[in-house]
Amino acid sequence: MILGIESSCDDSSIALMDENSLKLNYFSKISQEIKHAKFGGVVPELAARLHTKALPEMIEKIKPYFSEISAIAVTNEPGLSVSLIGGVSMAKALSISLNKPLIAVNHLVGHIFSVFLDKKEIFPLGVLLVSGGHTLVLDISANGKISVLAKTGDDSFGESFDKVAKMLGLDYPGGALIENLAKNCDGNLNFTIPLLHDKRLEYSFSGLKNQVRMEIEKAGEISQSVQENIAASFQKTAIAHIMDKLSKIYEMKKWQNFAVVGGASANSALRTKLENLANKYGSTLHLAPLKFCSDNAAMIARAGVYKYNKKEFINYKNLDIVPHLNYENFKI
């Protein structure tokens, strides 16, 4: 079995996956959302302390499986440096004590494998990655080379939801709260879709966020109906922005297989728009189970299986954390 360890942000998670059947034999995740909610966002030092407490307790529970572990896969990039250290340190210690090979996994690559948890991976593949930290449109070739076709120049899709939620007086994280409010209203505010007439294939959510701020200031008192209208109008415009650029890229690439991954990929309105786009081109849309859209170790273990079969191991002395995404070395 492949042991997956994930600690790139505020979720501590481990998983055991059979490298032959892809059966998920063990999965555990401890979310820190409640701990960070009162601060309105993730506090790195607090996240690190909680990882230090949670990971050893989680590993203790899988001791009966130690003899069955073939390799240890761990997220080492990108993420909060103080959080990454927790998982990487644990993986190194286990690698030495159990004499098992180490596998370094890019967190975003892990998200890509979240749509292949129980089935063989399919490449070439188009990918929309939407999360709290990234908004990317990717093209993955048959040999696993990743090309970045579009990315955000400021806030990410998921981050913009969190910030708008905060403006509306909602708790952190705000993505699901915005989505739930939006279900009660069609959204009749005419927010401008960012970069609509700009030929550049890139995303920007800061201007839309500013439009929301001005609407809130104009409204004055924020009643339930005003909250719902702003949330629905914002979500509709943010998704329209995603689809505007993605549709242009889809027309050029005409992918047979397309995936949407990342924490924000759980948004049902976004999924519906993507299903319509895939149907238009006769593509197969790959979606992760809602449980595995957000950060988790099952996807890290699954990416680990892929790398294990290719014998992509790394010596513990050479395994370092990389807080920021290295586009030059971004590959499956």
UniProtKB/Swiss-Prot annotation:
Its EC number is 2.3.1.234. GO terms for cellular component: cytoplasm. The lineage of its organism: Bacteria, Pseudomonadati, Campylobacterota, Epsilonproteobacteria, Campylobacterales. GO terms for biological process: tRNA threonylcarbamoyladenosine modification. The keyword DNA-binding does not apply. Belongs to the KAE1 / TsaD family. Keywords: Acyltransferase, Cytoplasm, Iron, Metal-binding, Transferase, tRNA processing. It catalyses: L-threonylcarbamoyladenylate + adenosine(37) in tRNA = N(6)-L-threonylcarbamoyladenosine(37) in tRNA + AMP + H(+). PROSITE patterns: GLYCOPROTEASE (PS01016). It is an enzyme of class 2 (transferase). Substrate binds at L129, V130, S131, G132, G133, D162, G175, N267. Binds 1 Fe(2+) ion per subunit. Fe cation binds at H107, H111, D295. This is tRNA N6-adenosine threonylcarbamoyltransferase. Its cofactor is Fe(2+). Pfam families: TsaD. It comes from the Bacteria. The keyword Cytoplasm applies. Required for the formation of a threonylcarbamoyl group on adenosine at position 37 (t(6)A37) in tRNAs that read codons beginning with adenine. Is involved in the transfer of the threonylcarbamoyl moiety of threonylcarbamoyl-AMP (TC-AMP) to the N6 group of A37, together with TsaE and TsaB. TsaD likely plays a direct catalytic role in this reaction. GO terms for molecular function: iron ion binding; N(6)-L-threonylcarbamoyladenine synthase activity.
